[in-house]
Amino acid sequence: MGAVVIILLTLSGCSIEKVSAQKQDKIEYTILKEAEFPEKVQKLIEENKTKEFQLTYQEQGNLYLIKGYGEQKTGGYSIRIEDVSLWENAIHVQTLLIGPKEENLKDEPSYPYLVIQMEYRDEPVIFE
């Protein structure tokens, strides 16, 4: 069984890489407004917004990190970025979904998501 897994990993081009959990450097990034999203990013969000998701997309020298929290029963949610940093060999992204304040409660469902833009990098991305 173990040999089958190794063969499948080899055939599919996948690799396993150890990721160091030591923070090294902050990364410059921009939080985009919806009007600034590339068309493909908007399409990816629309296709995935009903469930929680984490996606990356690369276009024209930029890397887009997309985090969605799926359908929420009400509106008024916000997302706080806790950390965007470069670890030894990975980009680490940590966000927090913040519930609505009493005065912001709405009866309609919402689909909170966040799009971060940065210069393209080769490192894998870890969402937390």
Question: How would you label these PLM feature ranges?
Answer:
Residues 13-128:
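Exposed, flexible binding/inhibitory loops of compact, secreted disulfide-stabilized domains
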Residues 1-12:
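Sec-dependent bacterial lipoprotein signal peptides
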